[in-house]
Design a protein with these regions (language model features):
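Active-site metal-binding motif and surrounding structural segment of the metallo-beta-lactamase
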Residues: 18-64
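Cap/insert and terminal regions of metallo-dependent hydrolase folds
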Residues: 131-207
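Conserved beta-strand hairpin/beta-sheet module of binuclear metal-dependent hydrolase folds
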Residues: 1-26, 105-123, 136
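Structured catalytic core of nucleotide-sugar glycosyltransferases
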Residues: 1, 41-45, 92-94
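Active-site metal-binding loops of divalent metal-dependent hydrolases
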Residues: 15-17, 41, 65, 97-100, ...
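Active-site regions of enzymes building and remodeling cell-envelope glycoconjugates
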Residues: 57, 72-81, 89-92, 134-139, ...
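Catalytic core of the metallo-beta-lactamase
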Residues: 83-144
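A short helix->loop->beta-strand "cap" motif at the edges of active sites that frequently abuts
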Residues: 9, 55-58, 179-186
Length: 207
């Protein structure tokens, strides 16, 4: 789970922990969360969706994601790629991602006052979206092809599944070359402070 806030509006991206664990880790009360955005149906991203709805938190997901969560489908807000969502001064535009599920989404989030923009995408084999004026980029990449190919601990079937449903490091770099990185925040040394990769290594996710 990730929190995006402008100090007035607080968005929760994903709810893949138990409801109790989410409350403990986030440092936010349920009443402080304006909305929860879910990228896709897998439990590590949507586990607490039904409980969030019961607690009064609006949950937004695609119809494909909702179809896999019958207990959330009736109450969830169904969204599509390209639709414009507004929460206070924050604007969210979902975009298509590529995973082994129905209708997965990533999110482009902009603060209308500061004009800061975040592009956020997890569990995707590729990205077709191109955005300008990005301030922050948070993209999950899961493997490097030569390391995956050499591994004798990962079954061939799983290797193929990884290749077809997750982002490879070099493909992420190619995608980044197509983006406008001129506005991405840098530190005093010129390193990209606004660029973050979620990389899975040795079965542990690090960010």
């Amino acid at each position: 789970a990730y929190v995006v806030s402008d100090g007035e509006t607080t968005l929760l991206l994903e709810c893949g922990l138990s409801f109790r664990e989410l409350q403990k880790r986030l440092g936010y009360g349920v009443a402080d969360i304006t909305a929860c955005l879910v990228s896709h149906e897998h439990q590590d991203h949507a586990k607490a969706a039904a409980q969030m709805l019961k607690a009064g938190v609006p949950v937004y997901m695609s119809e494909g994601t909702a179809a896999a969560h019958k207990d959330a489908m009736d109450a969830a807000h169904l969204i599509r790629a390209g639709e414009v969502l507004r929460f206070g001064h924050l604007t969210v535009v979902p975009f298509r991602t590529y995973h082994n599920v129905e209708e997965p989404l990533g999110f482009l989030i902009e603060d209308g006052r500061t004009k800061e923009r975040l592009l956020w995408a997890v569990d995707t084999a590729n990205l077709g979206v191109t955005a300008d004026r990005l301030t922050y980029i948070a993209v999950e990449c899961n493997y490097e092809e030569s390391l995956l190919n050499r591994s004798d601990r990962i079954p061939s079937v799983l290797k193929e599944r990884i290749r077809h449903s997750h982002f490879e490091v070099n493909d992420v770099i190619k995608w980044l070359h197509k983006q406008d990185l001129s506005g991405v925040l840098t530190d005093s040394r010129g390193s990209f402070r606004g660029l973050r990769f979620g990389f899975v290594r040795n079965k542990r996710r690090i960010l």
